[in-house]
Amino acid sequence: MSFNHQEIEKKWQGYWEENKTFRTPDETEKPKFYALDMFPYPSGAGLHVGHPEGYTATDILSRMKRMQGYNVLHPMGWDAFGLPAEQYALDTGNSPAEFTEHNINTFRNQIKSLGFSYDWDREVNTTDPNYYKWTQWIFLKLFEKGLAYVDEVPVNWCPALGTVLANEEIIDGKSERGGHPVERRPMRQWMLKITAYGDRLLEDLDELDWPESLKDMQRNWIGRSEGAEVHFNIDGTDEKFTVFTTRPDTLFGATYCVLAPEHALVAEITTAEQKEAVEAYINAVKMKSDLERTELAKEKTGVFTGAYAVNPVNGEKLPIWIADYVLATYGTGAVMAVPAHDERDYEFASVFNLPMKEVVKGGDITKEVYTGDGAHVNSAFLDGLNKEEAIAKMIEWLEATSAGNQKVTYRLRDWLFSRQRYWGEPIPVIHWEDGTMTAVKEEELPLVLPKTENIRPSGTGESPLANIDEWVNVVDPETGKKGRRETNTMPQWAGSCWYYLRYIDPNNSEALVDPEKVKQWLPVDIYIGGAEHAVLHLLYARFWHKVLYDIGVVPTKEPFQQLFNQGMILGENNEKMSKSKGNVVNPDDIVASHGADTLRLYEMFMGPLDASIAWSENGLDGARRFLDRVWRLFVQDNGELSEKITDAPNKELEKAYHQTVKKVTEDYAELRFNTAISQMMVFINDAYKAETLPREYVEGFVKMIAPVAPHIGEELWSKLGYNETITYASWPTFDESKLVEDEVEIVVQVMGKVRAKLTMSKDASKEEMEQLALEAIQDQIEGKTVRKVIVVPGKLVNVVAN
């Protein structure tokens, strides 16, 4: 007989809710464990089978840790601001708040149906004014510290969506949502100075237990590079520009310079003959995103300005070009080109037939670029030096002649923090008619997002908030001065930067988080989520955390001690699940047909947690069959406990049981859930063959399966006679001595050749080993004299006979 999953799951979910089984107390003597999931964006589509994979992993850990005596913080909430809700509201005329609330209710019900052990009293929602009051408070702190500032920035403007998009929201020059054209235009934007934390964000990665590949992605994004700035005068004018280079040693090999099309000097230095071509090129570039412009594989394009720069080291005149691969926002917006020794410069020079000059020996620049090390040539005072020596000497020369200086730069840009949308946190700043700007006072927070029917983009580049006169226009009660509220809103990243702190103290109206509580719970012990957030979310959260550390709000330098990215669950055809392909699997259907325990077990058994694996109905059926076998082993058809279960010990299962406890305990802790489940399957096979099942082993097994399949775990626990939940029962332990084999295989050799293999007690004495060995090879030594017997206890017996 199989178990009735619908009945059992409903029963235990009701029990947990009624008894607040997973409520986390703050005051406790127990050690702490904080298991965090990346909270979901509550989309209209609801939960998909990819969500529960990470959630089940943290849930298994949380449930095991509770049984091991830890006080576990395992919360859930909603990252609910953002573009999709606003887009839905624009398309349907409904309010984004209603849409979001409806979706959250759907998500919450779906998540509860999967039996996760969340403390729902700590639920947070980034769109709740009691929550975003503190998001705004953090913004005020950034503003006070000079880390939030306004700047004119060329942005990706999408006229159809009426908003600015981040580089990540653009694919092939079109918006990711809706595929609308995107163009570049300068706009007043709020920026956060994440670059001020570049070194700390880089150095502190070393202390974290994160996958190395993920740390490397962050290192590359921060992109620290050491080199020099070099100043170039523009021939025939008083103007000059500066370039940054990691290879100042190749300055003698520079044959031209390139400015970004947006560089401030371009209009000024372009000659009359080149004006038309330069302007046409600049207009064409406006349509491209930074990512497209810097694509390595793309065809090089550019235009000569007609102007020349003077190389400070030898007085040579170098033609100045503009090209889209140089970005105004990166470095200085200008580069010196050394085509003989730089790949990109070489390609550009080849396309436009520009000269090349060898200054480092080792290659043949008539055939290809040479980027390796070697002795310098054609370089006056650098001749004969290698790369490191030449860099040091050139920097010395640049500084002595005031032609340049040593410099460290970052690929990391400051964080563009404003969005021209309605559905986000209002930025608590007022712009006054006299040109000054002040922050809203702390006691006036939260600055609540006003309700409005009209959330169409203003079309001017401002957010829809600009349309709400009674909200936007303010008067200073003391001076009578008129002002306008900031109409930009914060990006979706803002609320997700600090939510892990609010779970610690979700109802505090006086402070972001109580200092004692935050000391108790930080850092997060394990954070599990998708790899798509590897760079931005984690970098932004680490940045905010460091700012909060600097102002004494948090006691740790880093928020997340251990981080793990789960893999992706693909469709049965190995393609990404998507509505358009029609291969999305809805967890509600699986919960109805197979049960939540089966879904949880299957997703953990599919393969390693970080692998991307195709969904399989057969695999799902197999997971259900295993749970049915477990049920049938312990429960009779009449619903009573199996008569095989007894209080007497059973030697034949002893080793298998202790092995299982050891492997499952270690594998759960290391997130190797698939191999832990395999081991439990092996144990169940052995248990079916056994005549009797010691009660201790049955209880231990039920405790081990419960974190993966909690409903069946609770039901079996109650059948074993317990009235309390299994949640806080103590985790089974294993005895190392029971894992050791009682018997060993002994090799018997005659004159060094193997003649027999014997099984005997591992404690057999030398005399016993010798006696048994001689009996076993009697026929081999007949008629010979035994000269010597060498015995290695527990291993072998070698007989010397002739």
UniProtKB/Swiss-Prot annotation:
HAMAP family linked to this entry: Leu_tRNA_synth_B (MF_00049_B)
Gene Ontology MF terms: aminoacyl-tRNA deacylase activity; ATP binding; leucine-tRNA ligase activity
GO CC list: cytosol
Motif window: 'KMSKS' region: 576-580
Catalytic activity as recorded in UniProt: tRNA(Leu) + L-leucine + ATP = L-leucyl-tRNA(Leu) + AMP + diphosphate
Domain of life (superkingdom): Bacteria
GO terms classed as biological process: leucyl-tRNA aminoacylation
Database matches in InterPro entries: aa-tRNA-synth_I_CS, aa-tRNA-synth_Ia, Leu-tRNA-ligase, Leu_tRNA-synth_edit, M/V/L/I-tRNA-synth_anticd-bd, Methionyl/Leucyl_tRNA_Synth, Rossmann-like_a/b/a_fold, tRNAsynth_Ia_anticodon-bd
Residue ranges that the Swiss-Prot or TrEMBL entry lists as coiled coil: none
Keyword Protein biosynthesis annotated: yes
Name of one Pfam family that matches: tRNA-synt_1_2
Top EC class of this enzyme: ligase
Gene: leuS
Protein name per its UniProtKB record: Leucine--tRNA ligase
Main location: cytoplasm
Its EC number(s): 6.1.1.4
Chain ranges for the short sequence motif 'HIGH' region as given in the UniProt record: 40-51
Family assignment from sequence similarity: Belongs to the class-I aminoacyl-tRNA synthetase family.
